[in-house]
Regions:
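Substrate-binding/gating loop at the entrance of the active-site cleft, primarily
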Residues: 51, 72-89
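Active-site PLP attachment segment
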Residues: 171-194
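Conserved PLP-anchoring active-site segment centered on the Schiff-base-forming lysine
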Residues: 60-78
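Short glycine/serine/threonine-rich phosphate/pyrophosphate-binding segments
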Residues: 48, 53-59, 79-80, 159-162, ...
């Protein structure tokens, strides 16, 4: 009931829909939401996008460049694949792209050892949408730390379902402080997007 009333007030104040870019419309509300989400998830900061899909595309675009190897699980969600392929198609900024065998720490380590670029982003899902299994997160984090790679986790299917407070696989595994980037979505847990 509280959420419905808040939504009605927001519609009265800002209208409904994304009729312009964020700085021209609801920035105040977005900043407040981001502060609350960052605190809830246990991160220093948070950035909201219209959808979880767009959040992953934006994250990859912001972090990947010509000095980066993007390393993906072979069962990666479409948002990770599309973000990677968009980044790879950017002239002058295109990263190296490699895939590791699904949920295989050995395969990931082999690729990190042989990468050609200075920086590495390892893109995984907390709970894989393709088959429902969980990432071998502890092993992946240890390997990424060993090879100075940044791990980016899509926890769309873990948020709301895993951990004592429902903040996802990072809470459940106790690895929150060792994973710098986590992407999630409102559409699967919170019942609202846009």
């Amino acid at each position: 009931l509280e959420a419905k009333e808040a939504a009605k007030k927001a519609i009265d104040r800002f209208a409904c829909g994304l009729s312009s870019s964020r700085p021209q419309a609801t920035t105040i509300e977005h900043v407040q939401l981001e502060k609350r989400l960052a605190k809830w998830f246990g991160f220093e900061t948070c950035l909201t996008f219209t959808t979880g899909y767009q959040a992953m595309l934006g994250t990859i675009a912001a972090l990947a460049d010509k000095d980066t190897t993007l390393i993906l699980d072979s069962y990666s969600h479409a948002c990770i694949l599309d973000g990677t392929f968009l980044a790879a198609g950017t002239p002058g900024r295109a990263p190296e792209v490699r895939f590791f065998n699904h949920n295989s720490a050995k395969s990931l380590e082999r690729i990190l050892k042989s990468r050609e670029r200075k920086n590495a982003l390892v893109l995984i899902e907390g709970v894989y949408s393709l088959d429902g299994d969980r990432a071998h997160l502890k092993e992946f984090v240890e390997i990424c730390e060993r090879y100075e790679a940044v791990i980016v986790i899509d926890d769309a299917h873990g948020t709301g379902t895993l951990g004592e407070r429902g903040t996802g696989i990072l809470e459940e595994t106790g690895l929150r402080d060792r994973v710098p980037v986590c992407v999630s979505t409102f559409s699967k847990t919170f019942g609202g997007i846009g």
